[in-house]
Regions:
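ATP-binding N-terminal substructure of ATP-dependent carboxylate-amine bond-forming enzymes
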Residues: 1-97, 128, 309-310, 315, ...
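ATP-dependent carboxylate-activation loops
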Residues: 277-299
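A glycine-rich beta-turn/hairpin centered on an aromatic-Pro dipeptide
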Residues: 308-345
Length: 398
């Protein structure tokens, strides 16, 4: 009998998962609250529904007699997915595991209890209590971030000489972006940032690859690009992988994809956070399959259905890099030289804005204007060519 899988969300990042699951021969039901979500048309059955409502999505799951559920590249419905798995006795993470993997405070507690390396941190709802802790218990720069949110929204770096009024302003911004209205105050780790793409099956933590990240500077740390495999020394990559594995084991998640984020300071890794899901920014859906030859989408889909994933390369590994267009803020007057993107080394490209749009300052990943993905023999060559293309496409703003 044909397996039935429910995909929670149908945005641009979920489209590759919806398409691949159908190619694998599964019946795909996709739900999204936006009737115009671009992925709905690719599913066998599209449902417009509130994917953050546990009761509504549990009703859909029962009516559709699903065999598995997946919420790729997003965190807003992780608890919903966990509840469905619990109630219908499906493969994949439980609701308790979903809560632990989306609440940064609980996540840090799990890391500390297990001995997985992570920055010193505390969680607050009251700005005055947070300010007192910052002054008394922390030294040097820190990060304020929403306790429950994904992406870079609401994150700010603060220095030791910050005034209370500015601290309070940034605290309230982070609180406004947090789904549980709690704010994390954490030690700032100075150093390069990485992500680790993982498949967990039957208790085994399988690291597929390590991703180098390029971000803006403080205060927002918006991701400008990624490359795979990592260009860092083998010993550094080994430490990063070990930290990520320890973090996943600390969370206790199973039969799912994981996307860990790690920074390295003075040669030592610190786990920033781990999502029990596929990574966004095309990392898990495009970059990882290209750089490893492993079909990570198929692996994650099969995990959700309780089917053992294939983690062997099925295509030749390549160097791969994604870079994002982030033009000068203003009204977009013209875009020129996009013909430079028509090259065999360009796997895909897209420009998100059109002439007449307002180009915002890049304060979150939602502010970026487009992307290009390049494949090459090595990641170094892919990076060089992607950077060249980013500079050759001209966005005129005023």
């Amino acid at each position: 009998m044909q397996k039935r899988i429910l995909v929670l969300a149908a945005g641009i990042l979920q489209v590759p998962v919806i398409k691949r699951a159908r190619e694998m021969g599964y019946y795909v039901i996709t739900a999204d609250g936006d009737p115009n979500a671009c992925g709905l048309k690719f599913a066998d059955k599209a449902i417009v529904a509130n994917i953050t409502s546990e009761e509504e999505m549990l009703r859909v799951a029962r009516e559709e007699k699903i065999d598995g559920v997946i919420h790729p590249c997003s965190e807003v419905s992780m608890n919903v997915m966990g509840r469905i798995n619990d109630e219908l006795h499906l493969s994949g993470i439980s609701k308790d595991q979903a809560i632990r993997a989306t609440n940064k405070h609980l996540m840090r507690e799990a890391f500390e209890a297990y001995g997985a390396p992570s920055p010193k941190s505390r969680c607050f709802t009251d700005v005055e209590v947070a300010w007192g802790a910052f002054c008394m218990d922390f030294t040097g720069a820190c990060i304020l971030k929403p306790s429950r949110n994904s992406g870079s929204r609401g994150i700010a770096k603060i220095n030791s000489n910050i005034q209370m009024d500015e601290f309070a302003r940034l605290f309230e911004i982070a609180k406004g972006e947090s789904r549980d209205k709690q704010v994390m105050l954490e030690q700032f780790i100075e150093g390069p940032e990485f992500s680790i793409e993982i498949i967990v099956w039957d208790g085994q933590v399988n690291v597929l690859t390590v991703t180098d990240k390029k971000t803006t500077e403080a205060p927002h740390f918006v991701e400008l690009g990624h490359n795979q495999p990592s260009c860092f020394p083998a010993e550094t990559v080994k430490k990063i992988k070990a930290a990520a594995v320890a973090g996943v084991k600390a969370l206790g998640v199973n039969n799912c994809a994981c996307h860990a984020e790690v920074k390295v300071q003075d040669g030592e890794p610190f786990i920033m956070e781990i999502g029990a899901r596929m990574g966004g920014d095309f990392i898990s859906t495009v970059l990882t399959p290209l750089s490893t030859g492993v079909d990570m989408i198929a692996a994650a889909v099969n995990c959700a259905l309780g089917i053992g994933p294939c983690l062997q390369p099925i295509t030749k590994p390549q160097g791969v890099c994604i870079r994002y267009f982030c033009p000068k803020p203003g009204v977009l007057k013209s875009i020129s030289n996009t013909e430079a993107l028509e090259d065999s080394r360009v796997y895909e490209w897209e420009i998100y804005h059109k002439v007449g749009d307002i180009i915002p300052e890049v304060t979150s990943s939602l502010c970026r204007s487009g992307h290009v993905i390049v494949t090459e023999e090595t990641p170094q060559k892919a990076i060089a060519y992607a950077e060249r293309l980013i500079s050759e496409v001209i966005f005129e703003t005023e």
